[in-house]
């Protein structure tokens, strides 16, 4: 991220290496340089041990990565790039627009995910990050306002439950990332075929069929107007019949 910049020419900086000097985020200390390698190894081991990743898992990984802050510079930018590339492997259509448009909100949300002041009854919360990533990954339209994150903000319009526009609330479902990606594609294109889902996600046909069966069993989707010429209907946010 810093290759070719003035920082990359400093003696204490090596592109791609873990930090050699302590750093902090929003006035809060992060992992010490001598702790970084072990903490990153533990974080990656914990995440990779999970066979089926969920929306909550990717959020938890991101928060813990930021708490470690393994690099001297560019941690937030690097994490954003990693996130975008990783989500694309599941078939999500994501880009850097959300990070650019809401960069200040995103940084503040990271701080609120780590900030505790127990003496004054203030606890760390990830709900603001949840809304950001829900917009990024799942296409919801939560209203992202910095003032909602102020610890003394009294009138809670931060929409921790309801988005600005009542789209299907995929962020509240018990699904893996693979299943969420397929569900989002069906939501956007109810006539999509299984072979098209294979192309979009890079998954095998058997995997797509398994996911579709799961989504139907959970009553998240159903087939209407026949098997051959019909289409899919998303039942999220609708009464099940």
What is the role of each PLM region?
Residues 1-241:
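FIC/Doc superfamily catalytic core
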């Amino acid at each position: 991220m810093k290759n070719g910049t003035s920082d990359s020419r400093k003696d204490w900086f090596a592109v791609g290496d873990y930090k050699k000097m302590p750093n902090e985020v929003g006035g809060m200390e992060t992992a010490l340089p001598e702790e970084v390698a072990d903490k990153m190894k533990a974080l990656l081991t914990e995440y990779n041990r999970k066979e089926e990743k969920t929306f909550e898992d990717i959020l938890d990984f991101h928060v813990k990565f930021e708490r470690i802050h393994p690099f001297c510079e560019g941690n937030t930018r690097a994490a954003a790039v990693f996130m975008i590339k990783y989500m694309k492997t599941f078939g999500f259509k994501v880009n850097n627009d959300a990070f650019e448009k809401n960069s200040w909100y995103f940084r503040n949300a990271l701080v609120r995910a780590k900030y505790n002041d127990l003496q004054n009854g203030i606890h760390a919360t990830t709900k603001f990050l949840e809304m950001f990533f829900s917009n990024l990954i799942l296409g919801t339209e939560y209203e992202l306002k910095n003032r909602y994150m102020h610890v003394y903000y009294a009138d809670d319009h931060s929409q921790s439950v309801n988005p600005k526009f009542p789209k299907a609330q995929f962020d509240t479902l018990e699904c893996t990332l693979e299943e969420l990606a397929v569900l989002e594609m069906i939501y956007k294109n109810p006539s999509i075929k299984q072979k098209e889902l294979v192309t979009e996600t890079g998954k095998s046909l058997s995997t797509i069929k398994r996911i579709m069966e799961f989504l139907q069993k959970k009553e998240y989707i159903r087939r209407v107007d026949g098997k051959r010429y019909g289409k899919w209907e998303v039942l999220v946010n609708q009464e099940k019949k």
